[in-house]
Amino acid sequence: MWHNVGLTLLVFVATLLIVLLLMVCGWYFVWHLFLSKFKFLRELVGDTGSQEGDNEQPSGSETEEDPSASPQKIRSARQRRPPVDAGH
């Protein structure tokens, strides 16, 4: 009789461990493939590590360069345009 009870408990505990392991693995893969791309969810979880979707530092450096770089880009774009003929 004790053999049957022990076997039943072993199966029950093994099933719970397998289910928990699958849930943890599923969360890990979903987090890394999809959810970590959203800054809002990273802030909720408290993940401050650099992720693929985290572009704060490059965008911060670009915004500092934008005031000086954007007029040059506009000028170069205007210079490349062919002159418009008013007679046609």
From Swiss-Prot:
Keywords noted in UniProt: Membrane, Phosphoprotein, Transmembrane, Transmembrane helix
Pfam family, one: DUF4750
GO cellular component: membrane
Topological type in the membrane: Single-pass membrane protein
Transmembrane portions of the chain: 10-30
Main location: membrane
Residues found modified as Phosphothreonine: 63
Annotated region described as Disordered, given as residue ranges: 48-88
Transmembrane helix as UniProt keyword: yes
Cell location: Membrane
Modification Phosphoserine occurs at: 59, 61, 70
Presence of the UniProt keyword Phosphoprotein in the record: yes
InterPro entries (UniProt xref): DUF4750 (IPR031851)
Biased composition (Polar residues): 48-61
Family according to the record: Belongs to the SMIM13 family.
Protein name per its UniProtKB record: Small integral membrane protein 13
Species assigned in the record: Mus musculus
